């Protein structure tokens, strides 16, 4: 599934074994020197040091420009005090995170260097390189994360953000990852955060951090508690509105946050690795490539359907992997149809188009029905129809290995328009003029309408009824039942 507003590198990872005699949930040892702003026995998000750090970071944000700098010298005295509160809090909290010791020490150094620079554009590369959460994928292990960064689907400015989170890594995922290797993949649960994460952002990617250069082949994290919570909220409302009789497995997910979190971990783990697997006609990460947005729709949907296909096969197992594989199939289907299709603006909404495409494909193949204002599925026939769409996208990719880039774009458009109706004013639908066809790829992209494939009447009506529900999921966590 896409979790981005702009194309981003997908990532892969493998857990590192931690010695058995290490506490799985680090606490402050009773015999260490006490620090007034860290109190033993309190949960992390209630620690005074965390609350001080969170308040200081939040107060610092209005002083920062979009690039993270603080240009007004008149704000520097206040900024120095706030940064001092941040670094003091990090040092006080560090004993709670022994696995992140090198990172937290480097973070203090980066903050001090930023102050010494006169609050120029921040450079937190050193602390980012020291932060390696993929090396400690242990269920429940906490992390303290503090960086100047933008948050995807959240803040567009590189402001100082702080968050507390913990790892989601159940035993069945550790077993699954031995086959579906994803060595830099990190799954997390949000505990508390600054305003940049009180949004729709559900990812933590290194490339969002303010730094002098972007490291290569690095980790990536997804907050599955947020994904699961908004799935449960949205699907509950949408199924009531559409009078959908939910299958028992899907109904279980709506009443069980942890079950749904684990299901999303499985989906995301397989999805992420799929970006660089298969017969691919182009750079699977699509880095720095400007192209029509419907190509991103197909790529994200391809990876979701690859996960769906894998889970159809795994669903025959009689164990935790099999149980969750059957639930992933519902998650892909309902998240794509009920949330993706009607979330966000209609400006080059590639995730939205993927949901529209899946719905229309299933409807046109007679396995999804909207009759007498009630939604229904022929569940026995759904897997074959979904896999048929996956096959169609895979076929497009395989054939395009032998095509020029813009010819691939044209073929991709034909696949999408064969299922979803384009805008009546579309140049692509009428046929691009000769000067565009003979020109540079930029002309092709410029000719795509912002809303090249408008919502159908079904989705227009559903969006109006679901608008408030979806809007209310901004900032949601697994605790918000």
List each language-model region with its residue ranges.
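An active-site-proximal "capping" alpha-helix that borders the catalytic cofactor pocket
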Residues: 296-312
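Contiguous, non-catalytic segments that form substrate-binding/exosite surfaces or channel walls
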Residues: 91-251
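Long, well-structured alpha-helical subdomains associated
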Residues: 40, 261, 308, 312-423, ...
